[in-house]
Each structure stands twice: as structure tokens, then as C-alpha cells.
Amino acid sequence: MRITRERHVYSLGVSEPVATVTAPCSLTVETCDCFNGPVTEAGQPKARLNFSHVNPATGPIVVEGAEPGDVLRVHIRAIRPEKTGALMTAPGAGALPDRVKGDTRICPIADGHFTFMGVERPLNPMIGGIGVAPACESVPCGTPGDDGAHLGTIGLRWGATRRLRVVVPGPLL
């Protein structure tokens, strides 16, 4: 089964499912980048982004028969990045807020490498978040929590297995 990136949400827990699966199964899930695509040019101002629509998650997918107390195991078999990636900094944000100026860079990606400011480096693609419906009504996909959601860890890459604790029936992965 293939689920395309056009079928995405910005909150876990409240959306109509796009598919139903029975575990164990194998899926191909296309994902959006964290900005859902609008960052396409160097120097693009942050002000052009709608920050209520960042960190989209493809789905949700009902896992039939999964009940509270179960653990879903999601194994990432492959990640195939796009041909470019975007980096964006915002003034006053991050670990060095007084030193950071707003900027946007577009990095070409080819043959397992990306190029940033003329330097080619190995690419280590990762998935920002994989989550399940939370016990509360909903959680924005950009919020880290027990449900998985936005993990932002380089450990969530090809070959990794993510275990998610089910807290609601048919947990909307």
C-alpha cells in the first residue's frame, strides 16, 4: 500500500483516517518536508511561512486491532530524499539568539550527499516524527511527546525501529 504526501495532517488524533491496515504489514509512505514545500529559494524571508502549518505528518492510518497497552513497532526500511533541501534561520531564535541573522539556503542533494556553501557532505536523512493518536483530543505534529510526534532526532533514519505505545483503540498512526 502506498500513501501519498498529499494526505497529511498537522495534528495527531483528530483527523479522518486515510487508510486502514492490519499489522504486521508493509507500507510506502511519502512525506512532506517540515515546511510542506514552500521554502524553495535562497534568501526567502521567514515571514512568508505559515507556522501553524509546519511539520506535517502523512496519514493518519488506522492500525486495526491495536488496543491501549499494545506497542506498535514501525521499522524504517528506506528514506529517499528530494533533490534539494532547505535550511532556515530566524533572528533571535536558537542557541545563539543574539548572533543569528535570518537566512534561507537551498542545498542540492545528489548521490547521497548535500552541498552547503560549496562544501559537499554525506547526507544522513531522517524522519522528523512518527506518532500515534494521543490520549487527549489532539497534539500538533510539531510538539514532542509520549505519542511520538515531532522527535527531531537523527536516530529516526533508515534501519531504525520506532516503538509507539498505543493509548487509544485503532491508534491513528
Annotate each language-model stretch with its function.
Residues R2-G13, N50-T58, V139-D147:
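Short, structured beta-strand/loop micro-motifs enriched in basic residues and often containing a Trp
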